[in-house]
């Protein structure tokens, strides 16, 4: 059977309803399943969603907070027993407990972010859904266009035009004060999200190996499967291909890392100061991006380089200590990252699907 073409992917579009609160009807789609959600804003995180603030990044992620609510099991209550209907003696069996993710990457792929989307011409007709943290807003555009009956191609947060970043990265950057995250959709600049993702993945592959032979050597079938796995939020399918990309026959040269630094709301002094700012006149979410080559091992090439060592080397004014956050900390997937974390381990366990570690600087 021929592989699906990622450029021709077009999910079934919903019919517009007049209800003021339209729940996402795509229960069968693993990419945009409408699920319960809970907010867990942690002190100091300021990310709008939380993975739980604990003593370490690993335990924060394994906590799973910020994702869909899961049935309780074995907690001493009777929630796992069959329930009887109040109107009859019929026994209604309860659903089996949902298995918990067994690894950090699997936990990250399971996290969902609730959205409340309105159109400029329909401010009182929201489209409410919950999307995976690793998904992209652009994948919602066909549904929103059909729902509002008008072309939709861009998203805005407080008048700031959002870039085509993963949803989780956008949440960490703009730190919404409450959930669901309220966005506005309109007609405007648009990107081919498949091209955007693949170009970013190729750049990450080049940084890791000094060339992009690993990803360029993928067959058309595997390249299509990689993008389809992101669209479908299919961790298992993604891992089969990503494992090949991460395990090159040569040693890892550099870790693909981008550091997002909050900048002053005043106008930049040069055109190069904010090359990747989303746009708009609002100072909300104003930032600059640092991207440079960061080796996975220290200067002596004997010990793994830690996050703290890299931050002190790249931004000594913000990170004078390589052991503890003094003036600033960094957020990754809604959780603070310990400075002792080895960069290569972070790359393998906590990179976005395109291969990049995206760290958000938070001033203390």
Curated annotation (Swiss-Prot):
GO terms for biological process: aggrephagy; autophagosome assembly; cellular response to nitrogen starvation; mitophagy; piecemeal microautophagy of the nucleus; protein transport. Conjugated to atg12; which is essential for autophagy. Keywords: Autophagy, Isopeptide bond, Membrane, Protein transport, Transport, Ubl conjugation. Residues 28-42, 269-286 have a biased composition (Low complexity). GO terms for cellular component: Atg12-Atg5-Atg16 complex; autophagosome; phagophore; phagophore assembly site membrane. The keyword Transport applies. It is a peripheral membrane protein. Coiled coil: none annotated. InterPro entries: Atg5, ATG5_HBR, Atg5_HR, ATG5_UblA, Atg5_UblA_dom_sf, ATG5_UblB. It is found in: Preautophagosomal structure membrane. Gene3D superfamilies: 3.10.20.620, Autophagy protein Apg5, helix rich domain, Phosphatidylinositol 3-kinase Catalytic Subunit, Chain A, domain 1. Residues 1-13 have a biased composition (Polar residues). Residues 1-103, 262-306 are annotated as: Disordered. The keyword Transcription regulation does not apply. Residues 43-53 have a biased composition (Gly residues). It comes from the Eukaryota. Residues 72-82 have a biased composition (Basic and acidic residues). There is a cross-link at residue 202 (Glycyl lysine isopeptide (Lys-Gly) (interchain with G-Cter in ATG12)). It holds the Pfam family ATG5_UblA. Involved in cytoplasm to vacuole transport (Cvt) and autophagic vesicle formation. Autophagy is essential for maintenance of amino acid levels and protein synthesis under nitrogen starvation. Required for selective autophagic degradation of the nucleus (nucleophagy). Also required for mitophagy, which eliminates defective or superfluous mitochondria in order to fulfill cellular energy requirements and prevent excess ROS production. Conjugated with atg12. Belongs to the ATG5 family. This is Autophagy-related protein 5. The lineage of its organism: Eukaryota, Fungi, Dikarya, Ascomycota, Pezizomycotina. The gene is apg-4.
